[in-house]
Each structure stands twice: as structure tokens, then as C-alpha cells.
């Protein structure tokens, strides 16, 4: 399924914990625009570009808080090669591959406003770099060409909806991650992975104020780093996040979470996004009528990289009308996008909660402090949006972003094809389990005594990328 309409997104600070069969790994996240003044126009333009850059094959960007003043880019420092060298990459659950700008690359970005220097990966400087041939098993995941010659490389060509492109070849080298060795303690551990070595970027990928060294995809396909680690038995295809929209932090984990426990609902099979079956929706007990197409085709997408929540127009109108019946306020439109109002008392006491019920009777409740955000003192806006999202078959869909998922531990279990969640204090910690059965605490603020890694995921637009990814064999 390929989504056509562009939307908005906001993402925030988080920590990544990657659990392998014998180890767990962590990254520290940091927000780009922390403390800066809210700017809805900037937020909207970021959202639009974000949507354009999400790969068409799959979609689920990472997330953080749902505050408009947090809009920006989130990145992580990873280490590649031997000896390991640091690179700043966008972390994207909406795409499949890890790719890095490589030498030579005359069109790669040379500067960024993110307070770090951009770096080009140099195969000649790494003793463990190896080219991936077109006859390699990895290349067979993405290329159906019958004209492969063993001496040729396995190359990729990505075209994004905003017409940005990335071209390069796949190579195999060491990825160094931070292994969790105990409660709030880590140490480095290397794993061999295949990633793209980008030699030609254009459009927003080749310039821009928020340029990074590459993109790290956490998608469902066999080409993602997560799938590569799972194929060798080094990790399970399970990842989780806990997003704190109060303090702007949280946890992102790849691997088994021991606690808190979550209730799960099945993923809709054979989808390019993280789709679930929404069975019902109510405003403090008052049921809303769901479009029949939504229930029939499982057209509800869970996307932590999207900050807001988007509904078909008829459902959106019913939602807002029912909320206002409980608490009448005078709405006005801000920047042609957001419905806002003045309010001086506690919103949780005045406005009703909104609940979603999914297959297997799994419920998710969103409170007023989650679905309302402040632009300035006593000026609130709804995070609900009339999205107008449709599939290629013109079926309407619902997109549930971070404002629905914040302050909850959300688990995506690709092995068992379920998604689950539980209310949780995302500024505290979670328990993760390693392959030996050991259980360790990992927190958002004090993960380890080892150097912490910065993490980032582009918090811009919503949905899945309208993109075409083509792979060919190049000399």
C-alpha cells in the first residue's frame, strides 16, 4: 500500500537499546530544537519533507515527544569500519537500509547546522570493508536482474517523493554498538552488516540545514540492520519505544522487553506499514461511527514518527463535535492548519478522554493533555487532524501518531506480527532481557557510565514515503 498525501510529523528525544542474543545495546538521543520557540510554519514544512523522505516500501519513523516546539531532526552517532569511526545518521523506521555518504561523493552535503562535522566513509581506510557483489545473497533480496556478473557490485538507486535521490553500492563492514553489560552499564561490541555506500545524492539529501551522514532504516524487509542481525541469530525482530511528551525524552529498544508487560493486537498481514484493526472509538463513553472501509481493510496505521493523528474528514468532524459537546470553546484556525482556542483552566478536568479499541479488545486511551498542545500561554490547539489519506485503491486510512502513543511503552513484535502497549512513565526505565535470561534496567536519562551516543530521527512529516527504490548491478 502506498500513501499519497503528505502530512505532518514531530519527533523527539529518545534512547535506543538494541538487544542481541547475548547482549543489549544503547544509544542516547538528543533533540535538535529543544527549548526553541514554537513555529508552526517551520513545523509544517518539516513535516512535509519528512513524509517525502519515508520509503514507499515500509513506514514507521521513530518518535519522541508530541510538542510542536520539538519539531526537528533527531540523529544518532554510530561507528562503522575498522578502526571504528563515528557517523551521524538519521534513524528511520520507515525505511529498510542503512546507507552512509562515501568517498568520493562530489554532491554529498559538506556542512550542517547540527553542531557536528559531516564525514564521508572511506572503504580504503577500513581494514574490514568488502564490496557486495551482485551475486551475493543480500543483493538477491533487492534485485531480480538476470544479467549479474560476479565482478559487478550490488548497487542501489532511491528516488524520494520530493525528487531527492541517493545512489551508491552496498558494502559489508563492522557496525559497532553499545552493549548493555549490566544495570545502566554498557561496552562496545561490533557486528558485521551490509550497508549502502552512497556516492551521489541530490535534492534535500544533498544540501539543507539539517544534513546528516546517512540514514539507518529499521524497516521490516530483509535489508534492514534489524533483519540482518535477526537472520544471524544476533537479535530478535522486536523493537519498542517509550516517548515522554512532558520532558521530551524516552526509550527506543530493539529486543525483548521484560517489563512492563503489554497487551497486544495483531498486525494486519501483508501491509507495507504497521497496520492494525481499529474496531471502535469513543469520547468518554460516547461511541463514534467508524467508516466501514476503515474496519474492513484494516486501514489504521500506527506511526510513532508522526506527531499528530489523522482521520478521514467525516470521522474527524464527528470527533471534534463530540469533544466540543462536552466542553464548548470558540475555535479559530492558526496557520491554515490547526484548530485552536483560548483556555485558562486545567484541560484534563474540562475535556474528555478519547479511547480506541483494537482487535482482541486491546484499548488505548488518549487524555486531553496528550491530544491538546499549547502554542503560547492559554492558547491550545487540537492534535487531531483531518488527514485525507488514501491508499492506491482510494480507501481511506487513519494514522495514529505520537500524541496517541506518548507516555506508553509500545512494542512492535515482527516475529509474532503483533503490536502492544502499556501506560508507563517514560522518564523512568524499562527492563530488557538478554539471550542468557539476564534482565537489566535501561533508562532514558542514565543509561550507562560509558560514553553516550546521540540519536536522531527526522521528525517531520508523517506517512510512508512515496518513493521508488530500485536496485541494479553496477561495475
UniProtKB/Swiss-Prot annotation:
Its EC number is 3.4.23.-. GO terms for cellular component: cytoplasm; cytosol; plasma membrane; pollen tube; side of membrane. PROSITE patterns: PEPTIDASE_A1. Residues 450-475 form a propeptide. GO terms for molecular function: aspartic-type endopeptidase activity. Highly expressed in pollen and pollen tubes. Mostly expressed in inflorescence, flowers and siliques, and barely in leaves and seedlings. The keyword Metal-binding does not apply. Disruption phenotype: The double mutant a36 a39 produces inviable pollen which undergoes apoptosis-like programmed cell death, exhibits a compromised pollen tubes micropylar guidance and has degenerated female gametes. The double mutant a36 a39 accumulates abnormally highly methylesterified homogalacturonans and xyloglucans in the apical pollen tube wall. PANTHER family: ASPARTIC PROTEINASE 39, ASPARTYL PROTEASES. Displays aspartic proteolytic activity. Together with A36, contributes to pollen and ovule development, including the apical cell wall constitution of the growing pollen tubes. This is Aspartic proteinase 39. The lineage of its organism: Eukaryota, Viridiplantae, Streptophyta, Embryophyta, Tracheophyta. The gene is A39.
